[in-house]
Amino acid sequence: MSYHYQMNNNNTDFFDSANYIPQMQMHHGYQDFYASDSTSSMPSSGTTQQALQQTENGIIQGQNGSDHGVAFHFRAYGGWRQHDWNSTSSWSIGNQLEMENGTLTMSHGATNDGNIRNNQQMMTSNHITTDSFRQIPPSGLCYMDPTPSLRLPKKEPLPVQRPMARSTPKPFRCQTCGKAFSQAANLTAHKRIHTGEKPFMCPVCNRPFSQSSSLVTHRRTHTGERPYPCAQCEKAFTDSSTLTKHLRTHTGHKPYVCSICMMKFTQSGNLHRHMKTHK
């Protein structure tokens, strides 16, 4: 919704208490202001200097004596804000207006109205701005760029919060050895170790396997497929676990340590064979 307020030619007071809220909404929202008064439409800088006159008490008046319409027009476009209003019917601008090259400059030099409290100044240096008026259409519509201090601050992106590491519950437990699993399918495959069941048969050599993944790896020995090559040498392997073991020969990593003599090994099978020497 837009608020359009026009200047009156009958010297109507724009700053009575009934119009205070719509006026402040218009200031903060940067709505369009239509100046129907010929003294406040400001078609050019030359005519503006002729149309505006500053009286001795600081109130700017037009040539026809309409002070409130012109004062309201420049309060709206000058970026002025109210801090203390003791009188809504009598308000003095108390500032000088200068027009240079189409730019309206407001300089804080005159005195404020006597009804304004001394300990709360109506204007400060931060309120005095210089606003460049763009080309004014024939209808008298004025435009003003938003004051930088009134623009909404940019919201900083929220930091990405990674979920906390949680231990996966393992509700499926083997009744033979007590080993627990997170999925029932893993427990079923594990039970075949105890029962010796091997339902997966190789169609080439009829070799049975307890898990389907073991059958897939075995069939690569017949096809010659080796999808896991080593980046350090020219060797390739049929499964990823064999490649991991091979890479330790290049890096020298030996994660398996004997608890008796502290001897290290690259593979767990080598550690098991070594432990038999201590018995």
From Swiss-Prot:
GO terms for molecular function: DNA-binding transcription activator activity, RNA polymerase II-specific; RNA polymerase II cis-regulatory region sequence-specific DNA binding; RNA polymerase II transcription regulatory region sequence-specific DNA binding; sequence-specific DNA binding; zinc ion binding. Expressed in ASE chemosensory neurons and in some other neurons. GO terms for cellular component: nucleus. InterPro entries: Znf_C2H2_sf, Znf_C2H2_type. Pfam families: zf-C2H2 (PF00096). Changing C261Y: In ot63; leads to a loss of expression of lim-6 and cgy-7 in left ASE chemosensory neurons. It comes from the Eukaryota. A zinc finger (C2H2-type) spans 172-194, 200-222, 228-250, 256-278. The keyword Metal-binding applies. Keywords: Activator, Chemotaxis, DNA-binding, Metal-binding, Nucleus, Repeat, Transcription, Transcription regulation, Zinc, Zinc-finger. GO terms for biological process: chemosensory behavior; chemotaxis; neuron differentiation; positive regulation of chemotaxis; positive regulation of transcription by RNA polymerase II; regulation of chemotaxis; regulation of transcription by RNA polymerase II; response to alkaline pH. Gene3D superfamilies: Classic Zinc Finger. Coiled coil: none annotated. Transcription factor essential for the identity of ASE chemosensory neurons. Acts by activating expression of genes that are specific for ASE chemosensory neurons, such as seven-transmembrane receptors or guanylate cyclase. Also required to control the left/right asymmetry in ASE chemosensory neurons by regulating expression of genes such as cog-1 and ceh-36. This is Transcription factor che-1. It comes from Caenorhabditis elegans. The lineage of its organism: Eukaryota, Metazoa, Ecdysozoa, Nematoda, Chromadorea. The gene is che-1.
